[in-house]
Amino acid sequence: MHSYRRAGLTFDVQDAGPREGEAVVLLHGWPQDHSAWSRVVPDLHAAGLRTLAPDQRGYSPGARPRGRAAYGMGELVDDVVALLDAAELSRAHVVGHDWGGSVAWALAERHPERVRTLTVVSTPHHHAMAWAMRHGDQLRRSWYMAAFQLPLLPELLLRGRLLGVLRRSGLPEADAQRYAARFRSLGAARGAMSWYRGLPLGELAGGLLRRGRRTSSAHPAPHRITVPTTYLWGRRDPALGRPAAERTERWVASDYRFVELDAGHWLPEREPAAVSAEVLRRVRG
């Protein structure tokens, strides 16, 4: 399949590998697209797995609705459910990086029956992130999330500056060039920035307001992840710090692996062998 539809929107998807193989859904982050996984998928295909890597809402040219509500986490999760339905898959292994990681956590939380295994790259569980915003330096690291709430200004400022930002962040040159080129289109830039104007930023803000509440690890918390889960994190990630990374395990009530790499944020592009190895390790149990 090359595309699928949901609610009048058309999503592009890269469907590759053995058709009879178990399916792995790969969810990209900001400001990436399906090509973020291009160095990861060869190892998965060689292991007999089928991969489906969509260009998500805001990134597919046919799926760029306007308005904050169109980018709420419920919509983003339902887009992935629609992909599974279109591919006639009752379940799949799910892998997500950056914002795609946020969607992967939420999918496993809301629809565990559709997720065989979960591998999240870089992004901590959202409740761990909310806790870390109240402790340590995560709030400082996440200042840009508030700045990106401004209407239109971030798009206009970043259109000519994104390449330099991505280079300085450690993204490989070819990937930085490709992502920045797409961002020069105002529609593409607006679609990508709309992720920051929806959820889960409101949930994080709510976490800040609930400063005085504590969740006891002695009692199961609601919405814990119940599927086998691996979380990969780079200790040199400038945006996502250690407190949230280490606290993520509290929100997984199934087999859990935490893999710390001596790396930064762009793990699919910079550390594809490590990512594919951990995906395969999780898929194989």
Regions from the language model: what does each represent?
Residues 40, 107, 278-282:
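Hydrophobic residues on the short alpha-helix immediately C-terminal to a glycine-rich phosphate/catalytic loop
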Residues 3, 51-53, 231, 258-260:
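Conserved beta-strand scaffold positions in the cores of enzyme catalytic domains, especially
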Residues 7, 17, 55, 122, ...:
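Residues at the C-termini of beta-strands that transition into short coil/loop
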Residues 14-63:
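Conserved HGGG/HGGXW glycine-rich cap/lid loop of the alpha/beta-hydrolase fold
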Residues 1-24, 46-49, 89-90, 253, ...:
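Alpha/beta-hydrolase fold catalytic core
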Residues 9-11, 23, 36, 59-90, ...:
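Flexible "cap/lid" subdomain of the alpha/beta-hydrolase fold that forms the substrate-access gate
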